[in-house]
Amino acid sequence: MNILTDPNKLKTSGCADVNASKCAEGDGEGSVQVQLDPNLNIGTAKVFSIYGKGGIGKSTTSSNLSVAFSKLGKRVLQIGCDPKHDSTFTLTKKLMPTVIDVLESVNFHSEEVRPEDFVFEGYNGVMCVEAGGPPAGTGCGGYVVGQTVKLLKEHHLLEDTDVVIFDVLGDVVCGGFASPLQHSERAMIVAANDFDSIFAANRIAAAIQAKSKNYAVRLAGVIANRSRETDQIDKFGERTGIKRVAHLPDLDVIRKSRLKKMTLFEMDHTPEIEAVQNEYLRLATELWEAKEPPVQGKPLKDRDIFDLLGFD
């Protein structure tokens, strides 16, 4: 019998469930860690994690990027890693039950869980999972990600997958919600052309760099979202070496697509919609064809990023 641990009972301070020496030498003394079980390797799929400031458009970006990969003929799985479980609703047209909801319903006896209980097919064949999370202020988000991957492997649902996209909540980069980085080969940060999201992006980049000491993940770059201009993002990139990999303009049709519970690939055809679709397809193609790891940038100290941004 496979009984999973209630996530509310997990320790969330210090180096819980981790090799302590690795913790100390990796992300720094006192960091909170969730150690990757070597048996939970996702396999041959290309794995991407999407981070960014809360409300910046990560779920919109993730869902449309998932569709873009599917339009290239790839088998795609999107995993939402937010207790709000709203990552995939433009793909599935509904709010899905989360992995944690399903596990709680069977008292964490995972052998009673069926794939159809937590995996749903969305637009253009994109498979969707909402990991969910423990109640606010309790438990560990990293546990949730780990158990989601474990269930997917137990049901052999990763064997026929080409691309996995983790859509990770807000700008939290604690040991728990940084755990998708342990599975990923590339991470991207969604940011607008403003101080707050670039400041958050800089701190996320530092977390990704810390994880890259012990894991294969590398920062692919910044996706400029909801931005007419990119001058501040580009200034940040010139200083840090973290490149901009895509530019998605501030278009009202993108907002409307969320209200219609649709991806941009389902919206009525217009020149501006086609331009954004093509940008997603270009990004998906570049990510799929990338042979060499990107050059690691050098995030700035908080004071330096504060002094850098703004108009002369």
From Swiss-Prot:
Q: Which SUPFAM superfamilies match?
A: P-loop containing nucleoside triphosphate hydrolases
So which cofactors does this thing need? Answer: [4Fe-4S] cluster
Question: Which residues hold ATP?
Answer: G55, I56, G57, K58, S59, T60, K84, N225, R226, P249, D250, L251
Q: Which GO terms describe its molecular function?
A: 4 iron, 4 sulfur cluster binding; ATP binding; metal ion binding; oxidoreductase activity, acting on iron-sulfur proteins as donors; oxidoreductase activity, acting on the CH-CH group of donors, iron-sulfur protein as acceptor
- Show the catalytic activity: chlorophyllide a + oxidized 2[4Fe-4S]-[ferredoxin] + 2 ADP + 2 phosphate = protochlorophyllide a + reduced 2[4Fe-4S]-[ferredoxin] + 2 ATP + 2 H2O
Q: How does it assemble?
A: Homodimer. Protochlorophyllide reductase is composed of three subunits; BchL, BchN and BchB.
| Protein name (Swiss-Prot/TrEMBL) | Light-independent protochlorophyllide reductase iron-sulfur ATP-binding protein
High-level lineage:
Bacteria, Pseudomonadati, Pseudomonadota, Alphaproteobacteria, Hyphomicrobiales
